[in-house]
Design a protein with these regions (language model features):
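Short beta-strand segments
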Residues: 4-7, 35, 50, 126, ...
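Conserved C-terminal alpha-helix-loop-beta "cap" of PLP-dependent enzymes
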Residues: 121-124, 136-175
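Short N-terminal helix/helix-N-cap motif within the alpha/beta-hydrolase-1
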Residues: 13, 42, 172-173
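Conserved PLP phosphate-binding loop immediately N-terminal to the Schiff-base lysine helix
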Residues: 1-21
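Proline-centered loop/turn at the N-terminus of a beta-strand
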Residues: 1-2, 30-32, 161
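Active-site acidic short loop of glycosyltransferases
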Residues: 27-29, 121, 129
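Conserved core segment of the aminotransferase class I/II
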Residues: 24-103, 113-115
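Conserved glycine-rich beta-strand-loop-beta hairpin in the small C-terminal domain of fold type I
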Residues: 82, 86, 102-113, 124-138, ...
Length: 175
C-alpha cells in the first residue's frame, strides 16, 4: 500500500482549522506527500514544489529507485525558484493575515458564500480552506440534466468559467 497525499492547501486554513498530514497518522505506511508554494504563497507561476517520502520504505526500495532514476533523467528544477523555499517556509507557525477576518481571502470567502446562499435554488457549505466553493444547484428548478452542458452554456452567456460537478466525479448534475 502506498498513500499519495496532495497537501498543497495545508496552509490555507480558516476558522481555527488545523492541518494534519496523512503521513503523521500512519507512520508505518509508506506515504508520498506532495506540496509546494503555488497555493499557500499565491505564486502559481513559480511552480515550486516538493515530494516527501515517509513511513516504511523496506518494501518499496525498487519504487524509490525508479523515482530517483526518473528525477535524475527527466526533471529540470527551476534552480533560482528553489532558493525561495527556505525563506518561504521559515516561519510555519505564523498565521497568514489574508486568512483572518478582514483579510482578502477570508473576506472573499465570506462574500461568495453569502452571495450564493442568497440565491433561491443555490446552497453551499462554507469552505474552511483553500479558494474553492462547491455550490449545490437545484437541478429541477433550473432544468439542468447535464452539468457539463450547463457550465458551457453559462460560459457562453455570462462569460464566467465554472467547473461542473462531474469534473470532480460528482454523479448528479446538481453541482
Amino acid at each position: 500500500l502506498i498513500i499519495f497525499s496532495d497537501e498543497i492547501y495545508d496552509r490555507l486554513l480558516m476558522d481555527g482549522v488545523e492541518h494534519t498530514s496523512i503521513a503523521s497518522l500512519c507512520p508505518d505506511v509508506f506515504c508520498i506527500t506532495l506540496n509546494g508554494l503555488s497555493k499557500s504563497h499565491r505564486i502559481a507561476g513559480f511552480r515550486v514544489g516538493w515530494m516527501t517520502l515517509s513511513g516504511d520504505k523496506s518494501r518499496v526500495k525498487g519504487y524509490i529507485e525508479g523515482l530517483n532514476m526518473l528525477s535524475s533523467m527527466r526533471l529540470c528544477s527551476n534552480v533560482p525558484s528553489q532558493y525561495i523555499i527556505k525563506y518561504a517556509l521559515g516561519d510555519y507557525t505564523k498565521t497568514d493575515d489574508l486568512l483572518l477576518p478582514g483579510g482578502r481571502i477570508y473576506d472573499q470567502r465570506e462574500y461568495i458564500y453569502n452571495a450564493l446562499n442568497s440565491i433561491d435554488g443555490l446552497s453551499a457549505v462554507k469552505p474552511k480552506a483553500a479558494f474553492y466553493i462547491f455550490p449545490k444547484i437545484d437541478a429541477k428548478r433550473f432544468n439542468i440534466t447535464n452539468d457539463e452542458q450547463f457550465v458551457l452554456d453559462f460560459l457562453r452567456e455570462k462569460k464566467i468559467l465554472l467547473v461542473h460537478g462531474g469534473g470532480f466525479h460528482w454523479e448528479q448534475p446538481d453541482h
